[in-house]
């Protein structure tokens, strides 16, 4: 197993798109994308923290309210490949800026929605921003990496925005909803996007693609057997996570009997653990992405398996939600680094389809999770999630046994 200093060149070294900028400017550029990821993920998963409030205010079930998570995922699945092909050779900097503007408009639409249908229209609009952003930002992480920062670390820097969103976004969203209502919470999120937009306008360097992505480029990752193995594992583990985590707040309320403040604190713990997990993944995945993903799957599976039995008391809930948060904080970075390892030359071309698949996972997970919660309850949902994670673990352990970070150096 190589040490950090012996990491594969494809992961250890950056591929700077902005080599003429100062080191400070390079760091500010990648941080502006990380902050954009924070704002976007806060917007995407804000309903997780306010699900009970929205459902109660609009007189709908928690499962029905879960469409606020499902519809953006569906729209993002279409937007990722369509935008990537449709924009041709456009400077990706302008795309990122435009998508941040769409995010602001989408959140404002939800805040002022007159009924649930208008609210969902705003969430569909958000899906466009989500799909386009992820198809662009993750694929360009290596080109935005400051001097001396590897691709795995650059990816984890951007993904840090995601995990910080779970620390500050979802829990603070739940807290703000209790303080001033869920509508004002979405309006505040829209306003937070304004400085993010300005930061990207002034800080992002030119991000011209090597060549325009064509429709025939989208399946680029699918031609690699080990990339397909990674996609299957991500599908199984991701479905389990999003099906279960979307309805954690209702579980805490109805099964554990926790009040809103306690639920917000537990979600904050989840996010804080996720930050640690994300940082851990930036280093561990650089050594062995396969072993890191196996550890992540095992921790998520243990969490979902024990949740119905031990998360009904505060200590058990805190321990399990912390373990779950740490594991999932590492998961997105592992998924991206896996693709850099097994298909380093095809990541940018194939990332839009990978992002589309990930968004389908979010949509299907929250959708079927909602149906299961409404019909069978959260305990059955968690049991099914555990089974899916176990299948993902076996996929990585057996079908992915040939995956080694040395593959990136050989490409």
Positions of the model-derived regions?
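Conserved MFS/SLC helix-loop-helix module at the cytosolic interface between two early adjacent transmembrane helices
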Residues: 78-117
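Paired small-residue
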Residues: 106-109, 117-126, 315-323
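Helix-to-loop junctions at the C-terminal end of transmembrane segments
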Residues: 79-92, 277-289, 373-374
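Cytoplasmic helix-loop-helix junction between adjacent transmembrane helices
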Residues: 122-161
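A late C-terminal transmembrane helix in Major Facilitator Superfamily
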Residues: 342-378, 384-385
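C-terminal transmembrane helical hairpin of 12-TM major facilitator-type secondary transporters
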Residues: 291-335
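Helix-breaking motifs and short loop linkers at transmembrane-helix boundaries and internal kinks
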Residues: 57-59, 91, 112-118, 257, ...
């Amino acid at each position: 197993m190589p040490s950090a200093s012996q990491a594969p060149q494809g992961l250890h070294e950056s591929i700077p798109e902005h080599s003429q900028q100062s080191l400070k400017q390079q760091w500010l550029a990648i941080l502006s994308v990380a902050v954009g990821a924070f704002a976007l993920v806060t917007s995407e998963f804000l309903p997780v923290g306010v699900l009970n409030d929205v459902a109660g205010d609009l007189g709908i079930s928690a499962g029905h309210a879960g469409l606020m998570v499902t519809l953006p995922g569906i729209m993002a699945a279409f937007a990722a490949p369509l935008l990537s092909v449709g924009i041709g050779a456009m400077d990706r900097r302008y795309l990122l800026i435009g998508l941040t503007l769409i995010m602001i408009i989408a959140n404002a639409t939800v805040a002022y929605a007159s009924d649930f249908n208008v609210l969902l229209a705003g969430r569909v609009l958000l899906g466009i921003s989500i799909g386009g952003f992820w198809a662009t930002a993750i694929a360009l992480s290596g080109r935005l990496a400051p001097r001396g920062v590897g691709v795995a670390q650059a990816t984890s820097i951007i993904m840090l925005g995601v995990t910080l969103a779970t620390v500050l976004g979802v829990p603070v969203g739940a807290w703000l909803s209790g303080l001033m209502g869920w509508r004002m919470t979405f309006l505040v999120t829209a306003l937070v996007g304004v400085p993010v937009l300005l930061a990207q306008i002034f800080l992002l360097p030119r991000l011209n693609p090597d060549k325009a992505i064509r429709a025939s480029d989208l399946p680029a990752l699918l031609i690699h057997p080990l990339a397909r193995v990674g996609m299957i594992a991500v599908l199984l583990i991701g479905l389990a996570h999003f099906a279960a985590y979307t309805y954690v707040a209702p579980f805490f309320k109805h099964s554990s009997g926790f009040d809103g403040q306690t639920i917000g604190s537990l979600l904050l713990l989840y996010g804080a653990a996720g930050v640690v997990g994300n940082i851990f993944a930036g280093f561990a995945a650089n050594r062995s992405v396969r072993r890191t993903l196996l550890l992540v799957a095992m921790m998520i599976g243990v969490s979902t398996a024990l949740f119905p039995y031990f998360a009904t008391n505060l200590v058990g809930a805190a321990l399990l939600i912390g373990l779950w948060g740490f594991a999932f904080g590492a998961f997105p970075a592992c998924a991206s680094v896996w693709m850099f390892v097994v298909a380093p030359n095809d990541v940018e071309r194939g990332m839009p389809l990978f992002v589309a698949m990930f968004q389908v996972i979010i949509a299907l997970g929250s959708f079927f999770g909602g149906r299961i919660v409404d019909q069978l309850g959260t305990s059955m949902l968690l049991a099914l999630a555990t089974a899916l994670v176990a299948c993902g673990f076996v996929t990585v352990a057996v079908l992915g046994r040939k995956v080694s970070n040395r593959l990136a150096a050989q490409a």
